[in-house]
Amino acid sequence: MKRLKNLFIIFIFLFLLSQVSAYITFKNIDYNAQYLEPSKTYDLYITIESDKEINNTVVYIEPTNQISKENIEIIRGKQWIGHLFPYEYGVAHLIIKINPNAPNYDYKITGYCNYTKGNQQYSENRIFTLPVRGKANLVIETTNNILKVGNNQILLLLTNKGTGTAENIKIEFQNSNNLMVLGDNTFTISALGSKTSTYIPLTIFAKKEGVYSINYKISYKNPYNLLELTQKSETIEGDSKTETLTYQNKNIVEETGILTFNVFPNELISINIKNPTITVGKIENLTISIKNNYKDSLFVVQISKYFIGNNQKSIFIKKGETKNLTFQIKVDKEGVTSIPIVIYFDNNQIEKNLTINVVGKADLVLSGIDIESSFNEIKITGDIDNIGTGKAKSVLISIEKTKNIIPKKPYENYFVGTLNPDDYGSFELHCQINGNVNEIPLKISYRDEDNNLITIYKTVKISKEVVSLKTNNNGGINYLVVGIAILFCVGVVYLIYRGFVKKK
């Protein structure tokens, strides 16, 4: 009894299986390439085979999962085939497009086949794999398209902006009339992956100013076959039609390009300081002179040390023009000093150190003045003090000759020498005075630390009554004779007195 029950179950299972067994078979899917590339459109050919006579046959496709749905666009996703005899093939011609940014991945699509047999409707399906391996897209960019006349060492940026790997890369640069590639002009790179970059060092000799270009040729290999349809033909014999497709393997890619450069003089700008020497500890104007050898541009100049107030200024300078910018600075230490500046213009940045000489400034004053008079001659003695911050070299003090003041040798001038800050030197001057004089003009000359000749003028007042001397004796009083006579009289009186005392 139990055995009969088992046989009955097997019979029912086989009957049901016969009712749902497939009458078609998915034979293959063809897209005429080893791999699919992003951004390309492909013809898909899905072939089915019927085991029985079927009708109303329709084949369609849908992305199987979410990632496939995001990266595969169905352009034509359904094909009517209709009636098929037993063991007859049916081909569905469908069209898809791969997303331009599709990453390397084995995407999935599901092929469906709906048909009728008798009065029954059936549906079969199969999952197909679409391998997308990406397409390399090599781009060469200049990191700086500005060259100077003469030799230029530059870096070119080679980037694979595509989604596939490029292998056996070869780049060849070609000289032009005014731009020459020095050294080896051919570069090879084994491989460059997607979204990666590498630098190409290049030495270019530019002959003269202007805008010039060099051409380049780049070739590389895709690591898979890229079949490209080159010919399509149809042959019709009776009721049958044969379609012949011819493909060419395009896995070797060759491209050309142009790199354009602006060539300028060796120095885009010339920078000078109008006043390279300033005084220590004093707020001074620093005037920077800029000559534009480049092109009409707005210049922004920035200094980073010693500035007082604004440290950044801008000015528009035409090509060939020279203009000045003035900053206020203060430096509290003597010596040669560097002032770092940065100049921005037209996406250029130039950094320089401007050199200035910071010097002290001598300040000479007179002290300890003493005036002695003897007849018609004046003797002036005193000190010259340097109360400044700079050195005074070759200090010379002299009496200015006037109508009534005649300097007398060997003391008409006095050489003091070098006076350092907080140093002093003594001097002695002689002159002859005629007429009424109440002050004596003095001239002090010296050389500063930049060897510039400095002259200052001072006057010394005679602290007594105004000296009145005459060189002409006619009608005048001879004070020397009067003095001798007085002394003689005093002597005579003294001798008489001594004689009188002895007698007594």
From Swiss-Prot:
Topology term for the membrane: Single-pass membrane protein
Superkingdom as given in the UniProt entry: Archaea
Keywords of the record: Membrane, Transmembrane, Transmembrane helix
Listed transmembrane segments: 6-26
Compartments in which it is found: Membrane
GO cellular component: membrane
PANTHER family: NPCBM-ASSOCIATED, NEW3 DOMAIN OF ALPHA-GALACTOSIDASE, S-LAYER DOMAIN-LIKE PROTEIN-RELATED
UniProt similarity note: To M.jannaschii MJ1506 and MJ1561.
Identification of the protein by name: Uncharacterized protein MJ0795
UniProt organism field: Methanocaldococcus jannaschii (strain ATCC 43067 / DSM 2661 / JAL-1 / JCM 10045 / NBRC 100440) (Methanococcus jannaschii)
Upper lineage: Archaea, Methanobacteriati, Methanobacteriota, Methanomada group, Methanococci
